[in-house]
Regions:
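Structured mid-to-C-terminal alpha-helical surface segments
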Residues: 1-139
Length: 139
């Protein structure tokens, strides 16, 4: 679960930065939804307190980003913009509605974009308290 969470953070960032390119906004919207869903999980809350585990997962992902085709090899976690920008991006706003119509089939499991934005702000707030997040370096 913790690795999936970190992977989704990086994916949301990469796709948000390229939301104007084909299918990227749709992919960003899926990851934002997933992050909104799992952000309240106890294992994710515990990850914020486990600097060693978070640092290790970030190091692995930052290394992987160096060779990823759609990656963000020069972007440090502390510089991620998707927390603040994704839910106001016009491409992502449109794609988010489409994504929910296609993938979130149970009405009570839908998360409105405003709520997702609130959850992204809360995630950013928690991560910006973590030394592992703030001090992560590109290998």
């Amino acid at each position: 679960m913790e690795r999936i969470f970190v992977d989704k953070l990086f994916a949301a960032e990469a796709y948000t930065r390229n939301a104007d390119k084909e299918h990227r906004a749709f992919e960003a919207s899926k990851h934002i939804y997933d992050l909104a869903v799992i952000s309240d999980e106890s294992r994710i809350s515990a990850l914020f307190e486990n600097e060693k585990l978070l640092a290790g997962l970030l190091s692995i992902r930052l290394t992987e980003e160096q060779n990823r085709l759609d990656g963000i090899p020069g972007v440090l976690p502390k510089d991620f913009i998707f927390f603040d920008e994704a839910c106001s991006n016009p491409y992502i706003k449109k794609a988010y509605t489409t994504m929910q119509n296609q993938y979130v089939l149970i009405a009570k499991e839908r998360i409105e974009l405003d709520e997702a934005q609130t959850k992204m702000f809360a995630l950013k707030n928690e991560l910006m308290k973590c030394a592992a997040w703030l001090n992560a370096q590109i290998p």
